[in-house]
Amino acid sequence: MIIFDKPSISPIKTKAMGRRAQLGTDATCRQSVMYDTYRMTARDIVLFLFVFLSLLSCTSDNEPSVTTTNRQTVTVAVTPTLDCLPFLVARDCAIADSMGIELVLIECGALADCDTALISGHASAIMSDYVRAASLRDKWARLMTSQTAGEKQKRTAGDKTVTASVDSLVVFPHQNSHLYMFVNRKSRIREARQMADKMVAVDRYGADAALAAYVLDSVGLTGKTYLVQMQNINTRVMMIENNMMDVAVVSEPYATLLRKTGHKQIYSAAHVKSENVGCLIARKNHQLIRDMYNRACDSITKNGLHHYDSLLIRFSGVPPKAVETMPRHKFLHLE
């Protein structure tokens, strides 16, 4: 009988087989780790794409629309007076935005600065008065004449890049600006006929001087009165507050400020219905600016003047107590 024993395996072969088994196990582990790593990376990529698309959708919602990016820029020069309040309301209460307008306000201390901004082209429109409007029309006519002559000379010289100016000056009268004449509280003046040899702070090239001349002529004043040129309305108020002027012509809200501090009002143009002291002068975008101003006037009429006290306080620098006691004003549309 032949008996076959189990083949004996030498220690060397056993060691080699163990190493191969270990290598096989390591390879399997590496494949598993690589698979796990690949699976985690794919998961991260999917998560990243989800977050990215979410952010992209949010960004697209916040991006301005086509109408917003194509908004028309309108620059208006204003003074710190009540008749300019509709432009503040249009800018800060989204009226201009709703009309597709990017409204930029140039804050000037005097109407003369507004005239300069309009003539130089820095402003599309300004708030002014009827006296300055007449003077500005003459300046504008001379400016257009000189520009036309210069353009003709350049065309004659062969410059084909010259184009004619398309801007035209349009004046819109309004009744939202009223002038008041005040006498210093320490003065003995009680009425206009006592203003002989007195100094009156006015803008000599504006409606202020016209009002002062009208008041003095209406009482038949025989003595001489000195109209002192002070274009900046804040300077006028400061001079009469410091007792350096006898009389000053101002508009709201500075008229209320002088009343609060004890100065005497001797004339008011607020109750003269035919008095169109103020006006808006535009050189471009005429109807667009007119419609924006009128919409803001409707908003003030609807909500009340004192709803916008904070805008007027910040704009004019008049103390809150004076602005809060200012009489009610009805804002009318531009004519």
In which residue ranges do the predicted regions lie?
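Bacterial N-terminal signal peptides that target proteins for export
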Residues: G24, M34-V46
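C-terminal motif of bacterial Sec signal peptides marking the signal peptidase cleavage site
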Residues: L56-S57
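Sec-dependent signal peptide cleavage junction
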Residues: S60-N70
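Sec-dependent N-terminal signal peptides
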Residues: I45-L53
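Cationic, low-complexity basic patches in intrinsically disordered or flexible, solvent-exposed regions
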Residues: L23, S32, Q153
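Short, glycine-/small- and polar/acidic-enriched structural segments
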Residues: T69-T222, L227-M230, D246-E252, Q265-A269, ...
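Secondary-structure end/capping motifs
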Residues: Q287-E335
